[in-house]
């Protein structure tokens, strides 16, 4: 459940900005039908930053209810205050989620020792499996391989989502962790190379609109069929890149709407709808991928 193509799911909203239960069900059904390994609910792509704490919990619980055991659900529970991250994580202790994705603290930029103590404290307050999340382009904070190695010794810290796009990190981390520690790419454009170097899968934005392709690509990679996997990846490469032509999740929400997976591409401020130019770029990438 922690390998293959794991989708960083968008949070669908109606025109007033309320979470749409019907569209959420449609998205979950789409991923169940198309081979997605698991769903990350209310991560960065799921607009965790603009949901209240109550809404955050409600969306995860709604996702669990609608998934109904058909696909594993991972809760995004990161925060830049350790006590807040612990509280968010503990909310899901007995909920049915299979694990939590916890991003490095953002904006306050802790030291490596601060990062270690932060994730150690979260792990000590839950039995849920923890997936570390390193995305310095968003957080301003880069968790180094040596810190990951220390954290990997903690029993319920079982994986990392490594979103630097720096492929040397795969080897660096693998040298410092046990063989059962899971390495997940957080960068669609380099995910296949990441897996070829020994990674186990990807937490994917692209999978929101290309679930079957991403699942097939990851399956082929896991089987060592990289030539075949690369055919899929080359077709998706413009999409991997253009889904970030504007800040995530602006482009992917519009793409979901364009494919009829959600009713609107509504976001909450300060996120604003995609520009006309951005829409044209994403549309061309969807067409190149054979999705539109």
From Swiss-Prot:
SUPFAM superfamilies (alphabetical): Aldolase (SSF51569)
Residues annotated as site: Part of a proton relay during catalysis: 44, 107
Localization per record: Cytoplasm
EC number: 4.3.3.7
Catalytic activity: L-aspartate 4-semialdehyde + pyruvate = (2S,4S)-4-hydroxy-2,3,4,5-tetrahydrodipicolinate + H2O + H(+)
Main location: cytoplasm
Active site, per annotation: 133 (proton donor/acceptor), 161 (schiff-base intermediate with substrate)
Pfam families listed in its UniProt record: DHDPS
Keywords noted in UniProt: Amino-acid biosynthesis, Cytoplasm, Diaminopimelate biosynthesis, Lyase, Lysine biosynthesis, Schiff base
Record-level GO BP terms: diaminopimelate biosynthetic process; lysine biosynthetic process via diaminopimelate
Signal peptide span: none
Pathway: Amino-acid biosynthesis; L-lysine biosynthesis via DAP pathway; (S)-tetrahydrodipicolinate from L-aspartate: step 3/4
GO cellular component, one term: cytosol
CDD domains linked: DHDPS
Catalytic class of the enzyme: lyase
One MF annotation (Gene Ontology) recorded for this entry: 4-hydroxy-tetrahydrodipicolinate synthase activity
Residue sites binding pyruvate per the record: 45, 203
Annotated NCBIfam families: dapA
Family: Belongs to the DapA family.
Protein task: Catalyzes the condensation of (S)-aspartate-beta-semialdehyde [(S)-ASA] and pyruvate to 4-hydroxy-tetrahydrodipicolinate (HTPA).
Assembly and oligomerization: Homotetramer; dimer of dimers.
Protein name as catalogued: 4-hydroxy-tetrahydrodipicolinate synthase
